[in-house]
Amino acid sequence: MLLKRLGLAALFSLSMVGCTTAPNTLAVNTTQKIIQYERSKSDLEVKSLTLASGDKMVYAENDNVTGEPLLLIHGFGGNKDNFTRIADKLEGYHLIIPDLLGFGNSSKPMTADYRADAQATRLHELMQAKGLASNTHVGGNSMGGAISVAYAAKYPKEIKSLWLVDTAGFWSAGVPKSLEGATLENNPLLINSKEDFYKMYDFVMYKPPYIPKSVKAVFAQERINNKALDTKILEQIVTDNVEERAKIIAKYNIPTLVVWGDKDQVIKPETTELIKEIIPQAQVIMMNDVGHVPMVEAVKDTANDYKAFRDGLKK
């Protein structure tokens, strides 16, 4: 019963911060059981690949090897478990869900390039190693959306469709009022204390799911420990504009679904207007009373919208 009650909440918390070591062993062990339960429910197995750079990339994969590959890319501060819950609703596709370099259980080198093109190149190496680089569907949330755009722009002939969920990288649309004046010293996405983490949890989601404070504290410490790398990555991505690369998506007429929560405080919903201007073929869905992570806040609706989009590609 505990697993069912806390599954989504603990899963999201993990997706925002990762999970390695923490001071509260009981909380960590309990959360790991919850996460493993969710992965098992979605038929996901965790695997890893050593990249040409020598870095390790960890990823989750389901067992639907006959489905068309769908590469799902998490956002800043996240990891593969951002998509574990919704993976249960996307069982008709061959899911590949990585921890990006710098996040989750993948390597975290301080000297790496974490901009969209560099991350896209690493993901393409993963897909090539698995023999799945051709006829790929790609989707991403927030920073993962910007990386999805970069991936499609670098390898347009290999991409069958694109799914952008509250995507970053279209910076000329401006920032929401909630982030006006934010710097690396006061950005709510960078965690200096447990209190910062609690505020971030409520900031990112419009209706955050319940999670015990003791578990939050464990993950807060992880974010505190990772702050130096998080700061470096955030500094790189906030200046990494993908709008020119998005024009390649328009040029190749890659089918694109754009999904946004109308209560997103991290990246303004009006960004959809700019994306539609740059990528005219894009379909846009605005979700009511949803924040920055629709695939966590509105799992069923987000999955159904995506499946309808994919079904439309067959017509």
Curated annotation (Swiss-Prot):
- The lipid of kind S-diacylglycerol cysteine is covalently joined to C19
Q: List the disulfide bonds.
A: none
GO CC annotation: plasma membrane
Query: What biological-process terms (Gene Ontology) are attached?
Result: acylglycerol catabolic process
Q: Where in the cell is it found?
A: Cell membrane
> Which keywords fit this entry according to its UniProt record?
Cell membrane, Hydrolase, Lipid degradation, Lipid metabolism, Lipoprotein, Membrane, Palmitate, Signal
Q: What is its main location?
A: membrane
InterPro entries cross-referenced by the UniProt entry: AB_hydrolase_1 (IPR000073), AB_hydrolase_fold (IPR029058), AB_hydrolase_sf (IPR050266), Epox_hydrolase-like (IPR000639)
Keyword Membrane set for record: yes
Bilayer topology: Lipid-anchor
Reaction(s) catalysed by this chain, per the record, are:
a triacylglycerol + H2O = a diacylglycerol + a fatty acid + H(+)
**Which EC numbers characterise this protein's activity in its record?**
3.1.1.3
Signal peptide from the UniProt entry: 1-18
One Pfam family recorded for the sequence:
Abhydrolase_1
Temperature dependence of activity: Active at temperatures close to 0 degree Celsius.
Residues forming the AB hydrolase-1 domain are 69-296
Q: Where is the lipid attached (N-palmitoyl cysteine)?
A: C19
Give the active-site positions: H74, S142 (charge relay system)
Q: What is this protein called?
A: Lipase 3
Origin species, per record, is Moraxella sp. (strain TA144)
Could you tell me the gene encoding this protein? lip3
